Amino acid sequence: GKDGNNSLMDVDLSIRSGETIGIIGATGSAKSTLVQLIPRLYDATAGEVLVGGVNVRDYDLKALRNSVAMVLQKNVLFSGTILDNLRWGDANATDEEMIAACKHAQADDFIQSFPDRYDSRIEQGGTNVSGGQKQRLCIARALLKKPKILILDDSTSAVDTKTDAL
């Protein structure tokens, strides 16, 4: 922590491939710190973080981060079209893959309601879409990356109950 104390103590967590888990705790209980240890946004000062049985420090940093997609509460959309924003997940994704990811993230319905659909412009920071729409687009972008590990860090806080079913 900022005061020199450990943010996490006595955490022992094993997640199997294909498993979905939720980590629940009070505000300030280091949930975000825990998930940010996986792609090494922070390094553990004690103990170890293993992915696939290998310490994350032993992975090539770029390879590790390419295998992880994180959708945060405050994600960023860039000025450009919806397609431009989705391509940040996978620059080589086909239109079909992008539409499938948006359907999975429950973004396709609202995209289809826009006059230019997937070619609709997004203002810098996504100021012309709602918070829930922005988060769904960010989830779709993360899904396009086809990550080995997908982390949703409070990323559904602005979406409605339909999206909570994700």
Q: Residues of each region from the PLM?
A:
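ABC-type nucleotide-binding domain
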Residues: 1-166
